[in-house]
Amino acid sequence: MSRLRPILSLILVFVAIFVVSCGSPKASVPTTYSPEKIEQLQVLVEPITEAREKMSVLQELIADQNWIDIQTYIHGPLGGLRQQMRNLSTSLLPKDQKAAADLGKELFNRFERLDAAAKERSISAAQSQYRQAVQDFDAYLDLIPQAS
């Protein structure tokens, strides 16, 4: 039995090498969006697009210098936007994910600065952050492929 152990070990090594070498190659990452993927992305982008359309409410609150409602709007209706944008960003192709994630982070940095401007009751800072937030929002939405 002691003479068979080295032979058995050698056979197991050969079997392991054979099994590993017969493994399938890695799946390639798609470089374009399929129609099914675009449909899926359109479902994910819908609430984000609705939030973008409602940004005019925030602009009106800033114009009225309604500081408490500005903060409430940022933390209320726009509160779930971060998670929705993160989910959408991770659903994009790898080449677009980083840009989408960076724009999403920048947008929420703008919201945080807008919130701080509302606390300080600074209309000029609030207007500036609002304009930049809208630009970031539009740039983010421009990354999302549209159905043809």
Which residues make up each language-model segment?
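Bacterial N-terminal signal peptides that target proteins for export
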Residues: M1-I11
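C-terminal motif of bacterial Sec signal peptides marking the signal peptidase cleavage site
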Residues: F18-S21
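Immediate post-signal-peptide N-terminus of mature secreted/exported proteins
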Residues: G23-T72
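Charged, amphipathic alpha-helical oligomerization/scaffolding segments
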Residues: V43-E53, V57, Y73-G80, N87, ...
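Short helix-adjacent coil turns
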Residues: Q65-D69, K95, L114-S128
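Short, solvent-exposed, charged loop/turn and helix-capping segments
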Residues: L81-A101, S148
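Short, low-complexity, Pro/Ser/Thr/Gly-rich segments in the mature regions of secreted, periplasmic
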Residues: D136-S148
